[in-house]
Amino acid sequence: MSRGLFASLYEAGRPFALIDTRERRDHVDGHWFGSTNIPLSVLTAGITRMVPDRDFPVHLLDWRDPASNAAAQRLSQLGYASVAHCPTSHPGGFGEGFVKGEYVWSKAFGEVLAHRCGLPEVTPSEYLQHHRDALLFDVRPTAEYRQFTIPGSQSLPNSLLLANMEALKASGRTALLHCAGRTRSIIGACTLKAAGYDGPFAIFKGGTQAWQLDGHDREHQAGRVFAGDTDNPAATRAFLDKWRIPFDRVEAGDIGPFVEAHRGRLLFDVSDDAARGRPMEHGILKLSGTNLIQQTDQAVARYHVPVVLFDHGSGSRAAFAAYWLRAMGFSVQVALLGGRLDEAPAPDAGQIETPFPVLAADELAAHWKHERPVLDFRSSAAFRAASLTGSSWLNVSACLSGSPPPEPAVIIANDIPHGVGTADLLAAHGWQVAGIFPWSSATQLEPAGIVPGDPGIAIDESALFAGRHYGNMQDSRDYLAWEEELPGQIDEPILAQWHRLLAS
């Protein structure tokens, strides 16, 4: 068992990563707080992105199953030289560091924050009866706002609050901040409080889920965007000075030397709130500043490693994220850029060596016509969107618990590196691999042969509270209750640290 492992590693104060390589569904159903989920099915891409230094101390949770053994072997093949194997198991209940759900680090932190700040909350019925003159603001990224929101709400992501405080105040009306549940609205309201905003504001309690639970319909495809940015960083610099967050001004020609001077740190470009983890030049990862705070344990695998946040324009996105990362216990600084970063060049697939044949479209068709197994190892979401007629969806972790098929199989993968990694895992388990077809070459296939797929029960997707945004009211009730209970289930030393930092 691993009770207390994360807390002991964290309290030691030395850099470390605690990795759980089970598939997403199993991890969400129960995991050790502080562990980062990098599933075996995407381990190669995930670990090299989140822990690029092959000498970095990695603590691998060993669930004593074939998939855990395969993960250990894969890390060794990738050159990770400092891997500690940590035997573990499900303790049979939740609490004392064993939790369920996703983004638990951020959600538990948000609940601690809510209890400390004591900010006003407005329920849906109170809004309709007494606060219809207030302005509703959805503080999620705009793309999520467009999917669904509360009728009449405007898009104002958390990471742009600092850049829009004057516009908020100029409205002369109460700002009601909401998200889909609780965490991001709590963070947003507390951001305004920390910034010294003196206009009226409150939290719309329970967000869109509470709105639905009260029997109201959501609005879809809304387009009212309140958020704006400015090229003037003066106001943001005032917040950085007030909060004592170190920052540098970095011009376009100086980015390379700046990154080299900060090599080994966590480098995030938070300048685009729609970003979802795009690799940028110099090894910088581009992601949403709003979601970096709401999904911290999906972005950060290396603890006790300083964070550098890159931003341009007003810099409000970096200032927002820096303030809350520091409150969570991270060492953080900001780099205000004179221009935008370029995306990293795509890897040259032609240089990848593989012992497995890489099939062209006609070769794949020949295998299919002879009724040989054609197995798709992409994500279930990708398979559901488009698949080869007659192919079957599989997940590599599930495959390792069973017997290999009697005849050679064709593997469909995202690309050649993904295919090679998957084929290596299967071959080590006794599979015969006839070849790899990278779905990046799917444009060569006959369009009539590509159809939506049915992956069945997909272990790479979470089933916990899965219906909360699709009309399942019980899932919504359970989800909101789960969020509020989280602080009592995480490791006590982390909880104590958050209280200490928030009190300072």
Annotate the PLM regions.
Residues M1-A17, T21-L135, V139-L266, V270-P373, ...:
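Rhodanese-like catalytic fold shared by cysteine-dependent sulfurtransferases
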